[in-house]
Amino acid sequence: NASAFEAEAVPDEFLPVNYEAEENIYGGYLMWNQALSDKLSMLAGVRVEATDISYIGNSIQFLEDEILIEPAIGTDNYVNVLPGLHFKYNFTDNSMLRAAWTNTLARPNYYDLVPYRNLVEGDEEIFQGNPDLDPTTSMNFDLMFEQYFSSVGVLSAGAFYKSVNDFIYVSQTEDPNTGYD
């Protein structure tokens, strides 16, 4: 029975998550596959991506007697060059060693990029997105040995190393000038 409930707008719950986002990614890939010998092959490639993003969020200020709402706009564009190099060495028809050097990226979640700002004066807290976040990038080295068995399947062992940059995380700081968290 809907009449048993009283409707109440709760803008602090829905306004920060209401946003418009536009993201365009333009990419291209070049690849070269080469047999270096009867046992060794190489695959080299590079992917280039250009990203354009724009967001419109809400800047919200909860004052004692009113709520101030203004649009917040954020844009960014960047280019990533992601080379890769793969080698495969066949010891036999059933055993091989693979080695790879790759570069990858992980873009931030849309909501993390939205330029929203939620200022709650009573709690002395500010929550906000960051449209200037860079994607997380990593340079990866992988080594894998594979042995195939006709009756059992495959036995493989591998090792890898990743160097991760621009890792995205949530932080909380206190501004001594304002007292806000």
Labelled PLM ranges:
Residues N1-T92, N118:
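Signature of Gram-negative outer-membrane beta-barrel scaffolds
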Residues E13, V17-Y26, D76, L105-V164:
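Outer-membrane beta-barrel signature, preferentially recognizing the C-terminal barrel domain
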